[in-house]
Regions:
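N- and C-terminal low-complexity/disordered segments
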Residues: 1-116
Length: 116
């Protein structure tokens, strides 16, 4: 019985990560905020999302700005961005999810929702 307890204790300390338990940092694969929504990469991805949505939905939205964003490391990077876009009138907010693998020059619009 003592050996079983020792094994469980060893396994616990092997997998235990104090910073995750205390809520510090982010878990691998978790979403983290984009620190600068004016970063050229984030803006490029947001414009790509609007352009792809326009092609798929036969729409004519015009990109205005990125309001906020999150990113997630996957096989590449997922970007979840809130975008302001206008369609002839006042700008409205939309939420887009874009999967990016820059080393393959690959980008895919996964979803585009809104106005939200």
């Amino acid at each position: 019985m003592k050996n079983l307890f020792t094994i469980i204790l060893i396994i616990f300390f092997f997998f235990y990560k104090p910073s995750a338990a205390l809520g510090e940092g982010t878990l691998s694969g978790g979403w983290k905020p984009v620190p600068d929504v004016t970063d050229p990469t984030v803006v490029y991805i947001a414009k790509f999302a609007v352009d792809e949505h326009n092609k798929e939905a036969h729409a004519s939205l015009k990109f205005v700005k990125v309001v906020k964003g999150e990113c997630q490391v996957v096989a590449g990077m997922n970007y979840n961005v809130t975008i302001t876009a206008a369609d002839g009138g006042a700008g409205k907010n939309y939420v887009a999810l874009v999967w990016n693998k820059p080393w393959e020059k690959f980008m895919q619009l996964v979803s585009f929702k809104g106005p939200v």
